[in-house]
Amino acid sequence: HVIVATGSNARALPDAAFDEERVLSNDGALRIGAVPKTLGVIGSGVIGLEMGSVWRRLGAEVTVLEAMPGFLAAVDEGVAKEALKAFTKQGLRFEFGVKISDVKVGKKGVAVSYANAKGEAVKLDVERLIVSIGRVPNTVGLNVDPVGLQLDERGAIVVDADCKTN
């Protein structure tokens, strides 16, 4: 038996690569040298919420943009409701049901253009932007063909219910 444990990388937005200066992955978000005045977070999963909460407690004004219409959809509704209250009380600002249309990086910050849940065009200007929209497997260049491994559409190794490959 062989275990393939190649890890993962943060998923980037299609038109906004991580520069780890203005547009940050969760790794880059831990390396910010000073507290930004304003911070945007795209994605309200566990990592995005953790990063937003940390930087809010340090003094940044934090806005979290989430594509899903609700908060923590995979969690019990009561727990999600209480968590949203707690994060809001900390001072995090949330917008749900957004559709990001453009991210422009400038010398002084990042401009995020999006449609809100009502379909209205909105622009958010922040010093830094954390993109926390999931992870992608590190399987590029793994050379799976000679050993017969299959990758799914996301690049993960295909396994059965017992975590065995083909």
Placement of each model-derived feature along the sequence:
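Glycine/Thr-rich phosphate-binding loops of Rossmann-like dinucleotide-binding domains
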Residues: A12-P14, L49-E50, W55, T139-G141, ...
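FAD-site-proximal beta/loop scaffold in flavoenzymes
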Residues: D19-K37, K123-L124, R128-N166
